[in-house]
Amino acid sequence: MKHTVEVMIPEAEIKARIAELGRQITERYKDSGSDMVLVGLLRGSFMFMADLCREVQVSHEVDFMTASSYGSGMSTTRDVKILKDLDEDIRGKDVLIVEDIIDSGNTLSKVREILSLREPKSLAICTLLDKPSRREVNVPVEFIGFSIPDEFVVGYGIDYAQRYRHLPYIGKVILLDE
């Protein structure tokens, strides 16, 4: 499919918003008294996770999960698979799930359900991008970077068939007539 990528959210805007999210998260957890774990959902969240964890000024651990509901195309599937689980125990800890983009909410709902069974002290979600118009499952999201329209986006860790993760901005994929 011939396509091009148009800048939707520039790099500077992303950096500024992540700094603000870091301040909000720090404020929320600074007096918790519990250990905190940021759980990045791979692969898409890796850039966001790296930048966000430097902005959160509360001592925290970092762990990762891989959950997938995407094939190689441009739409989500309802089937959610856990491909990599956490390495650490989260019982009694403040857990913040860090996601790149929330679309249908199916993947995040499943991950949240799995993690809640492990008895964390608290469980919250932070996403860089939110597509509320695509939501099929109501998932509580405490920290949102940007709400965006129903566009297929890439960049800043988000891919299209494993391409474009390297872009420093969020771009909109535009299909071209062939």
Swiss-Prot record:
Q: Which InterPro entries match?
A: HGPRT (IPR050408), Hxn_phspho_trans (IPR005904), PRibTrfase_dom (IPR000836), PRTase-like (IPR029057)
One GO cellular component term, please give it.
protein-containing complex
Q: Which UniProt keywords apply?
A: Cytoplasm, Glycosyltransferase, Magnesium, Metal-binding, Nucleotide-binding, Purine salvage, Transferase
EC number(s) recorded for this UniProt protein: 2.4.2.8
Give the matching SUPFAM superfamilies. Answer: PRTase-like
> What is the superkingdom listed in this entry's lineage?
Bacteria
Q: Which GO terms describe its biological process?
A: GMP salvage; guanine salvage; hypoxanthine metabolic process; IMP salvage; protein homotetramerization; purine ribonucleoside salvage
Pathway field of the UniProt record reads: Purine metabolism; IMP biosynthesis via salvage pathway; IMP from hypoxanthine: step 1/1
- Self-association state and partner proteins as the record states: Homotetramer.
Q: What does this protein do?
A: Purine salvage pathway enzyme which catalyzes the transfer of the ribosyl-5-phosphate group from 5-phospho-alpha-D-ribose 1-diphosphate (PRPP) to the N9 position of hypoxanthine to yield IMP (inosine 5'-monophosphate). To a lesser extent, can also act on guanine leading to GMP, but shows a highly less efficient activity with xanthine.
What else is on record for this protein? E.coli cells express two distinct 6-oxopurine PRTases, with very different specificities for hypoxanthine, guanine, and xanthine. Salvage enzymes allow a more energy efficient synthesis of purine nucleoside monophosphates compared with the de novo pathway. The kinetic analysis suggests that E.coli HPRT is mainly responsible for the synthesis of IMP and that XGPRT primarily salvages guanine and xanthine.
Name the family: Belongs to the purine/pyrimidine phosphoribosyltransferase family.
Task: From the Swiss-Prot or TrEMBL record, give the protein name.
Answer: Hypoxanthine phosphoribosyltransferase
Instruction: State the species of origin.
Output: Escherichia coli (strain K12)
